[in-house]
């Protein structure tokens, strides 16, 4: 039995193809390579100039249409779309003044919308024929902003002045609210005290001007000329309140009920 020829087997394996004969498979591969080379030849020489070394204005955006390969630009301030590069336009000069002008024009338009500083805002900005806004007076813009802030503080109050909390930019609203609340509380207290009437007046009648002046001196005692009146702490059984009353008083100065419990160091007296 003769041994197999290894070289013949190796050559047959090299020419073998799973898609058919060896020659046919190699031809198809060569055809695909040729088509790819032709496609690459067609795309060669097609370039798109992006001008990346010069920055676009901040409200412009550069876009590329994938289907047509065309570069276009969108102005997000007014929504316009154009194929003209705004950097190559003679009307545009890439300086900070144009950006400040646009921001100033937006502030002025907001001020006109709120009703404050309309004339100053109109004098503050001018529009050129190319559509860009330039600032003619910085002081006018400042005046418009001040008028806008004053309109907000007086008309809206940021949730303080208009609701009467007393903490807003205009403190008069809070003062009016406090005065109205104090007047209402005083009227209610006067009506309540008139109902108690005679009992409270009889209790307070025991004080004299000399007693009040002596107690205001901080001595703790309402001492008259003869030292007969002494202030003590007393508790009311009805309203559960403690008061400083004369030692001889037996009526609550708040509710008018009798039977005050006078307190001393050792307890009740």
Curated annotation (Swiss-Prot):
Residues 54-88 form the WW domain. Binds to HDG1. This is Protein CURLY FLAG LEAF 1. One of its GO terms (molecular function) is helicase activity. Residues 87-106, 121-133, 180-202 have a biased composition (Low complexity). Negatively regulates the cuticle development probably by interacting with the HD-ZIP IV transcription factor HDG1. Keywords: ATP-binding, Helicase, Hydrolase, Nucleotide-binding. Residues 17-44, 83-133, 174-218 are annotated as: Disordered. A motif (EAR) lies at residues 47-52. Residues 203-212 have a biased composition (Polar residues).
